Amino acid sequence: MRILIANDDGALAPGIAALHDALADMAECVVVAPIKDMSGVSGSLTLDRPLHPQLLSNGFIALDGTPTDCVHLGLNGLLDPVPDMVVSGINLGANLGDDVLYSGTVAAAIEGRFCKRPAFAFSLLSREPDNLPAAAHIARTLVEHHERLALPPRTVLSVNIPNLPLERIRGIRLCRLGHRARAKAPVKMVNPRGKEGYWISVAGDAEDGGPGTDFHAVMQGYVSITPLQLDRTFHEAFAGLDSWLEDLL
């Protein structure tokens, strides 16, 4: 088996190194990751210029593009033979609830699924790497047994791991996405030359984070696994929209 590993924290981030090391003895692993931190870019593709892969001293391939660029290129011309699956992460920071809409980590996995490869996205609930060994162990366990999964087509698994050592993790829970409250207001700043600018502020707290959600599971010390579907059609809205359109036309 050949695994394409990507992320959004960048090719030199500790999370992707930990993930690579955890999987390297069970499969041939090839890392293609952004040359710099590309957190929050979602599934954007670079269309206004060529992309330039660069081989790093650790054997990883760094790309001057987005996480989705990395997977798209890795599965469509850069790598031969083409990898059999895509594993994204390990992200330093949660990708819970609405985070999945912005996450480059999740988007990399989604691009893998677009290209008809099984795909995981792994995130650790910490900006610090202390518990990466536990997260890497869990990632390895899930990837190692992925062939036993009977997932519908066009499904991606988003996995969030609590910031705990392995012995304190209570188990794994299958969860739905929760929802966050509105993000905090952007922070206005003025640079030394008097030019105004804004920092995008932190994400909102969990607004829908009760039992059954990914928020609740990780706060209780469980790994959360959420199956994400690529079809974002809201089928339940069809009836109301049909009658609305009839009135308009």
UniProtKB/Swiss-Prot annotation:
Q: What is its EC number?
A: 3.1.3.5
UniProt keyword terms in alphabetical order: Cytoplasm, Hydrolase, Metal-binding, Nucleotide-binding
Q: What is its main location?
A: cytoplasm
What are the annotated GO cellular component locations? cytoplasm
Listed InterPro entries = SurE, SurE-like_Pase/nucleotidase, SurE-like_sf
- Cofactor, free-text remark: Binds 1 divalent metal cation per subunit.
A Pfam family that this protein carries is SurE
Keyword set includes Metal-binding: yes
Q: Which reaction equation describes what this protein catalyses?
A: a ribonucleoside 5'-phosphate + H2O = a ribonucleoside + phosphate
Regarding protein family, the annotation reads: Belongs to the SurE nucleotidase family.
Q: What's the stated role of this polypeptide?
A: Nucleotidase that shows phosphatase activity on nucleoside 5'-monophosphates.
What is the protein name for this chain? Answer: 5'-nucleotidase SurE
